[in-house]
Amino acid sequence: MKTKYFIFTALMLTGIGFASCTKSSSNPTIANLTFLATLNGASEVPANSSTATGTATFTYNPNTYILSGTVNFTGIVATMAHIHLGAVGSSGAIVFPLGGASPTSPISFVSTALTTQEQSDLMNGLYYVNVHSAALPAGEIRGQLIQQ
């Protein structure tokens, strides 16, 4: 009788052990990344003496590949604003338009899913925010997006 009880108990405990073991079917969530930029005329290429200033705060979600954020500026009547591709000290092509024609502060932005190349450029510090004006159509204030 003791043998039957022992075998029954062992089988029950084994069954409970297997039942409590579950394989996670979801991938781990990766934390969002924050990118900040300080915009001013001195950061433009070439630099200018504008007294306008601005800030940009962007969040990149590596789980959805979405970049979103806000650009604030003062002392400028903007005609356009963009995120450009380019290292510090160099100019580059527009990657993402921000706020349409004649945007006002603050500008909010949400991307579609970034491509592998766009993700790489963002992570390598190759994106900058540029706010344009009628006086300086190539860009009045600029700031490099830096991961925090």
Give the role of each language-model region.
Residues 10-12:
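Hydrophobic helical h-region of N-terminal Sec-dependent signal peptides
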